[in-house]
Swiss-Prot record:
Name of the molecule in the record: Topoisomerase I damage affected protein 7
Superkingdom of the source species: Eukaryota
Residue list for modification Phosphoserine: 628
Organism in which the protein naturally occurs: Saccharomyces cerevisiae (strain YJM789)
GO CC annotations, alphabetized: vacuolar membrane
Length: 636
């Protein structure tokens, strides 16, 4: 005994929202102009004869009518927005005692939106001038009429004249009716096609293509009808009294002119816009098809009418003249818009769930041959995808079988015009088939590519770091080299080096050597002093080694001099010869030069000073170290 029971039923509710928005602003520009000119001349020429009869009358009437010039500019903007929203309808979960569960869900279609825009439109209508002329020349009343002309399409014109004459009065009335009618119609057709497909490369039965078709038809018709009516009446009375004398005859006359003008125009337009949308979805697994049709129809009707009337009156007389004009103008504008119902019918579709069954029974050894190959395709803007079943011969050590696996190939549109599936059988091992079942077949193909990408990334990082280090080393080497060159330039460009270079001795380098040798042992100092005895710049920076100037050599010519002159010589030589570059002129040479012996100058060489000459012992040099002065002080 099976008893069915419902576990739960939940109704989530249904929400259906339809929003319809219609906007149609219009702007019109009307320009009207009407000119009516009526000219009438009457000439009375009396003739001899019986006064009881009316004299001949010559009358000419020339009415001129200019029709209304209508300029109509209308801009219409139509915007339609239709949206619908649907939610989950119901959800039912039921089960029975036989361990069978059923779960079903039904959804309404998704939100849809339509937008329709009508472009602006302008209508220009103009009517050519129209004139009418009539001439009456008759004794009793003979009428001649000229039919007016109008340059317009679909135009009807009617004109009527009536005349009545009597011995004492003449009545002429005219009526003019003008009717204009023009129509304008426009039909537009919009068509949009789109196709989409949903497919899965792993399962060939889940290919569900859908087709959507959207077409829009817009029909617009306009009809413009204009009616103009002009009526005018002219009344003239001529009185002729009977007299038998030859006196002057007076003819009093009275005239009345009445004109009536009526103008009426109407404009009607009809706009019908409809949209038809078709959508179909095909599910090969369930062999079912669903078609939904949505229709939107929006007719619009509008009418414009205007009327104008003018009634002038003219009544001149013989004694006085007056002009009474009565005009009336009325304009009516009527606009009516009608919205039609919008119907949309989209039945819900239920997708059949796919079922997958895995059996643990051993694979049979029987072979199957797939002779028929079905090809399906899907395409986008640049690529075409072909789906077919490829035959594989799976071979293993214990079993061999033939199976068909779904295959997808992507081909560019510019490369191929037709495609045929290969009929050959591909041999593969059991691992290939196992990877296909697991869904990891594509991952194995991409392993080699991932390894190559990893090596490329590592190589790029190492190369970048090495290049940065090399650049840093090059910059550091250039900076150090530039700093050394600048320091060397400063040392060689000093003042002392310039003076030493003039005398043939580079003083800068030797001064450094002397300062270093002064810090060594006493034996090294003695060797340095002995080696540099001939170098006047050896003790350049040793200010203590400076001594008093060397003694004055004995005079060559011994002459008798008074004591005052001797004192002057000693004082002079002591003050002038205590520097290293003091003059070695002796008093005898100075005295001889003062006595006129210019050619008897001393032949001795310039003496450098005490402590630097070779003939001075080392002890004497040490005794005069405290009284020495430096070379830089001499320069200052």
């Amino acid at each position: 005994m099976n008893s069915n029971s419902t576990i739960g039923r939940t109704t989530l509710g249904e929400s259906d929202t339809i929003s319809l928005s219609f906007s149609e602003p219009s702007s019109s520009l009307n320009s009207r102009s009407t000119d009516v000119v009526f000219a009438s001349t009457s000439t009375l020429v009396p003739q001899q004869g019986s006064l009881t009869s009316l004299p001949p009358v010559s009358s000419t009437a020339t009415p001129t009518y200019y029709s209304t010039s209508l300029t109509y500019d209308e801009t219409l903007h139509t915007s339609i927005d239709v949206s619908s929203t649907s939610t989950l309808v119901s959800s039912t979960d039921s089960s029975s005692s036989s361990e069978q569960d059923t779960y079903s869900s039904q959804y309404d279609p998704a939100t849809s939106s339509y937008s329709i825009i009508t472009p602006s439109m302008s209508i220009f209508s103009s009517t050519s001038p129209m004139s009418s002329s009539s001439s009456i020349t008759s004794e009793w009343s003979s009428l001649t009429s000229t039919t007016p002309t109008l340059s317009s399409s679909a135009t009807s014109l009617s004109s009527s004249w009536s005349s009545l004459s009597s011995p004492s009065s003449l009545l002429v009335s005219s009526s003019l009716s003008l009717s204009l009618s023009s129509s304008y119609s426009d039909t537009k057709l919009f068509s949009f096609d789109s196709r989409s497909s949903i497919f899965s490369p792993s399962t060939p039965t889940v290919i569900s293509p859908s087709y959507t078709y959207l077409s829009s038809i817009s029909a617009t018709s306009f009809q413009i009808t204009t009616t103009s009516e002009l009526s005018s009446s002219w009344f003239s009375t001529i009185s002729s009294p009977s007299t038998t004398s030859n006196k002057d005859t007076t003819f009093p006359s009275s005239s009345r002119n009445t004109s009536t003008s009526f103008y009426s125009s109407s404009l009607s337009s009809t706009n019908d816009f409809s949209t038809i949308s078709k959508s179909s979805k095909l599910s090969p697994s369930a062999s079912s098809s669903t078609v939904s049709i949505s229709t939107i129809s929006v007719p619009t009707s509008s009418s414009v009418s205007s009327s104008s009337s003018k009634v002038p009156s003219n009544r001149p007389s013989s004694s006085s003249s007056s002009d009474d004009t009565t005009s009336a103008y009325s304009s009516t504008y009527t606009f009516q818009s009608l919205q039609s119902t919008t119907s949309s019918s989209i039945p819900p579709t239920t997708q059949t769930p796919s079922t997958s069954t895995i059996s643990t029974s051993p694979i049979p050894t029987s072979s199957q041959v797939f002779n028929t190959v079905a090809i399906s395709s899907s395409e986008d803007s640049k690529t075409i995808y072909y789906f077919y079943t490829q035959t594989y011969d799976i071979t293993d050590s214990s079993t061999t079988f033939v199976t068909g696996l779904p295959t997808t190939i992507a081909v560019a549109k510019s490369e191929v015009t037709s495609f045929s599936a290969p009929s050959s059988t591909i041999t593969a091992d059991m691992s290939f088939y196992q990877h296909w079942l697991d869904g990891s077949l594509d991952n194995n193909k991409n392993q080699g590519t991932s390894k190559t990408n990893t090596g490329t990334i590592v190589g790029s990082v190492v190369g970048s770091v090495g290049g940065i280090l090399i650049c840093v080393l090059v910059v550091w080497f250039m900076l150090v080299r530039k700093r050394k060159a600048k320091r060397h330039f400063k040392e060689n460009d000093s003042f002392c080096h310039e003076i030493g270079r003039r005398t043939g001795f580079p003083t800068t380098a030797q001064a450094k050597e002397a300062s270093l040798q002064a810090q060594d042992s006493g034996s090294q100092q003695r060797n340095t002093e002995t080696a540099s005895a001939n170098n006047p710049f050896s003790n350049e920076f040793n200010f203590k080694a400076r001594g008093n100037p060397p003694p004055v050599p004995p005079p060559r010519n011994v002459t008798a001099m008074n004591g005052s002159f001797q004192n002057m010589r000693s004082n002079f030589m002591d003050q002038e010869n205590r520097f290293s570059y003091g003059s070695s002129f002796t008093y005898s040479s100075l005295g001889s030069s003062t006595q006129g012996g210019f050619s008897t100058l001393s032949s001795n060489s310039i003496r450098l000073g005490r402590g630097l000459d070779n003939d001075i012992s080392h002890d004497e040099r040490n005794t005069v170290q405290n009284n020495s002065q430096g070379f830089l002080r001499e320069i200052i």
